[in-house]
Amino acid sequence: MKTKHVYRVLAVSLLGMLLGACSVFETSADSIELGANEAVQIFTDTIDGSEIFLDQSAGYLVFPRALRAGLGIGAETGEGVLRIDGKTVDFYRVTSGSLGLQAGAQARSMIICFMSEAALESFRNSSGWRVGVDGSVALIDVGGGKSIDSQNVRDPVVGFIFNSSGLMANLTLEGSRFTKIVR
């Protein structure tokens, strides 16, 4: 019983140090913008149809590097941009937490597309938009085909999680919170 408590305290302490280290070094607007440009380039280079998908959206979030780490208790954080008509209009932070069997760290990129003006406005007017509470995000998994067709997507908000190798499968954004930040 006492050993479990020690492990929990250790896990929470390590997680706090990991995420604290991420937030100590505030990322500059230029650095976030550069990372977002690179993430969009990787996305459009590796997934056929993605450029058309971005063009048809009312706006989209780009998180070039979201760090997920955990040891029993997990957390994720990252900073990104909201783009409308391909231009950055605001900066955002994503955060989430989870409990369960997990150990390690992973960096990933995310693009979340608002396919309607109503979905985009709902997001922009919130003070901290939470997936599963304020709206849902349909994650797109293209499998081995590495192509997407925007004509078949009917969801108002769709997300893509990827790394330099392409889209990543079996992931979730449930419980993630997106908060506007000043840069």
Feature map (PLM): residue ranges:
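Bacterial N-terminal signal peptides that target proteins for export
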Residues: 2-11
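Small-residue-enriched, tightly packed secondary-structure blocks
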Residues: 23-183
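C-terminal motif of bacterial Sec signal peptides marking the signal peptidase cleavage site
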Residues: 18-21
